[in-house]
Amino acid sequence: MVGEGDQHMAVGKAVVLARGLGTRMRKADASVVLNEEQEKVAQKGIKALIPVAGGRPFLDYVLSALADAEIDKVCLVVAPEHEELRSRYSREVRLERLSISYAIQERPLGTANAVAAAEEFVGTDPFLMVNSDNYYPCEALTALRELTGAGVALFEQNVMLAESNIAAERILSFAVGLINGEGCLERILEKPAQDVLATLPRPLWLSMNCWRFSPMIFEACRRIGPSPRGEYEITDAVQLAIDQLHERFQAVCIAKPVYDMTSRADIPSIAARLAGIQVRL
């Protein structure tokens, strides 16, 4: 069943999760040389505002890719104290292709809790959901936008290993999407054991938290309980939507990499990969 009201609606909205605490970004790393501005922002842990190619914040590139995919309304889910994020996009930057709203996630209670904070922004519309610390290829965002219903972008593991900036040991532990015979998501396997991975068909398709949702996801977010680590996880909400609400998530399989901004070691590699990309907000 396709989410109500989402069968033929064009997607113009995206929710960007920007509430992260940045614990690993704050951690000093003597092997990484940062400039003064990068060091200043890294100490605060605001990954999205780390200056990269051309001195522009990483989030500028994430938002520009959404605009390239014809998204024109974005909601940043932020912490109450993230005034710098709100100030940049409300006052410091001229927005030509995007309008940007904000939703406050009062406490860091997980990705489903963050998505729920944006319910007023979403209303009855379908929407994309992405992380603020990942740069997704425009092809993935466009493919999700063009679906007729809910969906997930999954990324080929071998391509991620060869072309992403993410360390191989991290990629090998990433969640894997299981796809049924109809081309829809059946389940997300979080941190699957090697013996389990060995039984799965190749190639492996990784979930990088890049979704198209219908408003039905908010009901799923309300129904789930906390995970073992005490957070409300969007993957749990998706599984509930599949199992109990009969939502179908079409799988969009992408053979391009995702870049990840987690620690200071990621800054130089991302800056090199984003050099030459034009940002237009």
Identify the role of each PLM range.
Residues E84-L85, E139, A237, S269:
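Phosphate- and divalent-cation-binding pockets in alpha/beta enzyme and binding domains
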Residues V2-K44, A48-M129:
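Conserved N-terminal catalytic core of the sugar/cofactor nucleotidyltransferase
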Residues A114-F121, N165-S173, A265-S269:
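Short, surface-exposed amphipathic charged segments that create phosphate/polyanion-binding patches used
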Residues R91-R97, L178-I179, A241-D243:
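Short, conserved catalytic or adaptor-binding loops enriched in Gly and charged residues
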Residues D6-A10, A14, I188-L281:
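Conserved alpha/beta core of the MobA/IspD/sugar-nucleotide pyrophosphorylase nucleotidyltransferase superfamily
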